[in-house]
């Protein structure tokens, strides 16, 4: 279970304080192979594979369920199908743009108040910042997500959590489902 504010892999300003470093310390004889990558401020489940074969199998068959708190009221369920590209003047920011890569996000409203909605989300594709970009695109940015228009009056990071993973058994048939409760 990855806490918020912990990068998955080394990057600028984060060379040793990552989940990958923790994995390497725990399993010194194995290569670090993250299967699903979470943004630094996203909490939840993150899977590492012990072999290249397992990483490949898991990467293409892993099913993920995310939970997000978005601004505004959404009810029911819906799908956002909008291509995502890198913002032309940024190496970090993504945007919806016609020449982007296809991206599909399914969401279902679980509960709401007059300011926020808790969503369960399922991705068909795995683009960088996909949930964050798609929710902002439909006018409901994630609470706390200042990069994509969210306000920080309720939370000081994007309110995004990977709460459930359905993993295929690599050398057997069947699946394993794991879950992580929403943080406070």
Give the ranges of each region predicted by the language model:
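Residue-level signal for inorganic ion chemistry
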Residues: 1, 47, 68, 107, ...
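RNA pseudouridine synthases
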Residues: 2-88, 101, 112, 159, ...
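Ser/Thr-centric signal marking residues that sit
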Residues: 18, 42, 105, 117, ...
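Conserved hydrophobic positions within beta-strands
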Residues: 70, 106-109, 142
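Short aromatic-glycine motifs in intrinsically disordered, low-complexity regions
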Residues: 90-99, 153
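Pseudouridine synthases involved in rRNA/tRNA modification
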Residues: 101, 111-116, 124, 128-184
């Amino acid at each position: 279970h990855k806490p918020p504010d912990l990068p998955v892999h080394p990057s600028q300003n984060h060379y040793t304080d990552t989940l990958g470093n923790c994995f390497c310390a725990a399993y010194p004889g194995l290569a670090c192979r993250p299967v699903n990558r979470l943004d630094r401020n996203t909490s939840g489940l993150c899977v590492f594979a012990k072999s290249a074969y397992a990483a490949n199998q898991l990467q293409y068959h892993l099913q993920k369920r995310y939970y997000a708190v978005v601004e505004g009221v959404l009810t029911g369920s819906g799908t956002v199908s909008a291509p995502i590209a890198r913002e032309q003047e940024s190496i970090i920011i993504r945007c919806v743009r016609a020449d982007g890569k296809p991206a599909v996000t399914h969401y279902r409203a679980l509960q709401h108040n007059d300011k926020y909605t808790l969503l369960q989300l399922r991705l068909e594709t795995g683009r960088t910042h996909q949930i964050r970009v798609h929710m902002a695109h439909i006018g409901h940015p994630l609470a706390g997500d200042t990069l994509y228009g969210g306000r920080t009056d309720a939370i000081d990071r994007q309110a995004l959590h990977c709460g459930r993973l359905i993993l295929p058994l690599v050398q057997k048939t069947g699946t394993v489902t794991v879950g992580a409760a929403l943080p406070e």
